[in-house]
Amino acid sequence: MRSLDWPFRGTEALAAGLLTPHQLRNDFEMVHRNVYIPRAATLTAVTRAIAAWLWSGRTATLAGLSAAALHRTAWIDDWLPAELNRPSQDKARGIILHSDTLDDDETTVCHGIRLTTPARTAFDLARRKGLTTAVIRLDALMHASDLKLADVELLANRHRGARGLVQLRRVLLLADGGAESPCETKTRLLLVGSGLPRPQTQIEVVNQWGTVLARIDMGWEDWKVGVEFDGAHHWTDPAQRTRDIDRLAELEARGWRIVRVSADLLRHRPHVVVARARSALLAGGCPL
């Protein structure tokens, strides 16, 4: 059997002589009608999107999370269903079908696959699911692409009758492409939702020669207060732990107060995060 990219349409692979019917039955798994992947393979957000597009006969437009995946957006769970934009009565397990009207400037082509532009993708993601989820998804899309929120606002003005515009406008006010993980987004939303000033993201701290010593997840440069979300490896990896200790000493030597946030704090004791950030801001001279 020759090398075979996947997902693929079974009838096309057979017609091209890339495999035999026996190989197709025994070595591959059908994920949608006539669409196959190797039995040992696991679908990612990208390959799940491509599989859905192949199921449509290459006629649908990737939308929502599937479009975001092809725009290289991170933090999309692999198990989430693919999303296509195509007026159709057909249904397939694991595929969400939308029937939105898309203007010509709201779609683009990537590797031969038609999908919604970053702006249109953001327009759709920001209107769906809850506020926090929508902000997380927009943060990730902004971080991965050249998305400009002004372009999303233009689409909101164009499609004034679309559902979810109230949430979309709230999401646009809260989104920030500087977030590098969903937990960073959640931390920022917690701080803003508690009445603290909106923090900057990815603050660079430099020495007297302009060399970057540290990049702080978020904070308030005017008052030298930083907030950092530490993933599990910051606590379990000895080398990372040593680097963090040295880095914190460097920042404190330059007058910074750092509030460290863990998953447990964020999930179970968010009030502690807010209290520590508020205390640090007051100590730094912020007029709260």
Regions found by a protein language model. Give the residues of each.
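Surface segments flanking catalytic/ligand-binding clefts of nucleic-acid enzymes
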Residues: 7, 12, 58, 142-288
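Short gly/ser-rich loop at a beta-strand->alpha-helix junction or flexible surface loop bordering the NTP-binding
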Residues: 1-166, 183, 282-288
